[in-house]
Amino acid sequence: STRYSRKTLPKQYSLHDAVFNISRSSMLAGVFLSKRWNLLKIAAEDKIHQDKRMALLPALFAVRKEALKRGALMSVLSGSGSTFLNICYRDDSSKLASSLSKKFGEFRVLELEFDNTGFNIE
């Protein structure tokens, strides 16, 4: 749960780690605007929460390693850890999903398309 996961996080962070994460989140926005997908892995680096929360479910470290090895452009923990997001080229998605499903059968793997319109009210 989010509440339990938050307990693994420190109450304070170093200025270095905070600046690192702010720079990466800014870079991530730039990557999506410029479509420089080769920079996604760097833009997804984190020093604030991912590794601390992933320690609650250590298999996620192997998931991230395998996903990046199998073609993911970025592999990140989303939120408190109920979701792990891997972004890859469309041509690699089935192969990546299949590989992760076979190797990590205890997890549910969903292969989804990007939604470039988001939420709309008509």
Kindly label every feature range from the protein language model.
Residues 32-122:
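Glycine-rich, charge-dense phosphate/pyrophosphate-binding loop(s)
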Residues 1-31, 40:
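Anionic-ligand binding region
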